[in-house]
């Protein structure tokens, strides 16, 4: 499932599921399951991925103290077809970067905000907030957006 994360670069126990908890454990040589194995539905666009050169251009921009609009504006000007903002905490986006994101959306470029935090994702938001990636990491949100864009062009 989407909750599984690689937590360490080289340890044998490099993976974890954070707040979701374990799926199972091995006790006395036997597997003890706590819940069913997650099965993600196949995204409609996954079957027609083709060559990576034809994939939509979706970039990740990091929000931080003092973030400027120029990086997001430059990506949109260069032809980005989607933007994911890796926000602080609960997906917070610096004010100047948020204005640029709203400009991108107005120009037809989808934008999603995700959290840079390892666990928790983006929960709750005021009605005027930028669209949320939910519990997806910025990298997962980028892949989802690419698949959404591919599906939209195939339809």
Map each language-model feature to its residues.
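ATP/nucleoside-binding phosphotransfer catalytic cores, i.e., glycine-rich phosphate-binding loops
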Residues: 91, 95-155
């Amino acid at each position: 499932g989407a909750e599984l994360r690689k937590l360490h670069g080289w340890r044998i126990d490099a993976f974890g599921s954070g707040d979701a908890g374990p799926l199972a454990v091995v006790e006395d040589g036997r597997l003890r399951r706590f819940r069913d194995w997650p099965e993600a539905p196949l995204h409609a666009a996954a079957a027609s991925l083709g060559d990576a050169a034809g994939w939509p251009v979706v970039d990740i921009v990091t929000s931080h103290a003092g973030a400027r609009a120029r990086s997001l504006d430059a990506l949109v000007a260069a032809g980005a077809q989607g933007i994911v903002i890796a926000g602080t905490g609960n997906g917070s986006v610096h004010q100047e970067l948020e204005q640029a994101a709203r400009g991108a959306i107005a120009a037809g470029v989808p934008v999603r905000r995700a959290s840079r935090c390892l666990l928790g994702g983006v929960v709750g938001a005021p009605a005027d907030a930028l669209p949320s990636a939910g519990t997806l990491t910025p990298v997962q949100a980028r892949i989802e957006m690419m698949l959404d864009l591919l599906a939209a062009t195939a339809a």
